[in-house]
């Protein structure tokens, strides 16, 4: 018998009534998002011939489309996937920064001298003197074509998107690899859309030194995430989002448990722990558990506590290895005092779980703020109002 069943209904209630996204919000925001993206992509393809040639599709990434979003469905991470012509002879090699690679265009000069490929001439402005694709130059190029393409809908610093008779006002903000389009709707709704230009490669370019995927998804992305050192502007961050999505899909209680862990992170103010770190805990669990689905089909309380304990083990070792390259410790950038405080908090949570096994509400203070507790838990006894099916993850 699962000794954590005493808090099962509480976890189900919180997952269903606090964490899970509202269907009406999801549907409404998806309609608006699709219309805005259609406008942007059409204008980019019309105004820039090289973008039109390289663009393939949008990858809808991030926690929202992984079914892991906590809160409101108003933040979207979108990768605009670009491809390079084979005749440029792209060569990907591992960089000396963990998680990064170099991309060299081995035949770029000969390629650009072919009359049929003159539309790619802007590529020569995106590489450094040694033929490596430059992150900052690519981001500058992308910023330029976005702003110039949207000029005809711009008034001052505001971009006006006309959708189904309504005006949605947008502003563009830069941060890291993303250009964030902040949208304000006529009804007061807000939406943040992160657009990132990424390059997509097939399996034959899989970089050495990174774990080989057994996934059905064989392509991977490189992301223009700049390093602080300006001399390293040809370092590209690897992204295996398609493989990770496949690994965590169809795993029973995995997604509800991960959403609970993210909710706990937010409630405890562990802001230095990125959502991707928590996702990585589950990626390692998926590999360690293997093909047996019985673990993920167990109760939500059991799957959640097992993940919390595994998370604590990583914290205790001061090492959370990047799933695709074990030598890359995701916790290396955290100060020891920060890690010590986080370890202490998680130990206290686990101690309360083990010692208060007759109090199903003992876990609540770690998952809900005082305001959330009043708003949600006063609606009725969670032991009676929730059932096991409320924890089902949302599919997109």
UniProtKB/Swiss-Prot annotation:
ATP binds at residues 63, 75-77, 241-244, 262, 275-279. Its EC number is 2.7.7.86. Mn(2+) binds at residues 286-287, 292. The keyword Oxidoreductase does not apply. It catalyses: GTP + ATP = 2',3'-cGAMP + 2 diphosphate; GTP + ATP = pppGp(2'-5')A + diphosphate; pppGp(2'-5')A = 2',3'-cGAMP + diphosphate. Residues 380-396 have a biased composition (Polar residues). Keywords: ATP-binding, GTP-binding, Immunity, Innate immunity, Magnesium, Manganese, Metal-binding, Nucleotide-binding, Nucleotidyltransferase, RNA-binding, Transferase. Mg(2+) binds at residues 75, 77, 194. Belongs to the mab-21 family. Nucleotidyltransferase that catalyzes the formation of cyclic GMP-AMP (2',3'-cGAMP) from ATP and GTP and plays a key role in innate immunity. Acts as a key sensor of double-stranded RNA (dsRNA), the presence of dsRNA in the cytoplasm being a danger signal that triggers the immune responses. Directly binds dsRNA, activating the nucleotidyltransferase activity, leading to synthesis of 2',3'-cGAMP, a second messenger that binds to and activates Sting, thereby triggering the immune response via activation of the NF-kappa-B transcription factor. This is Cyclic GMP-AMP synthase-like receptor. It comes from Aethina tumida (Small hive beetle). The gene is cGLR.
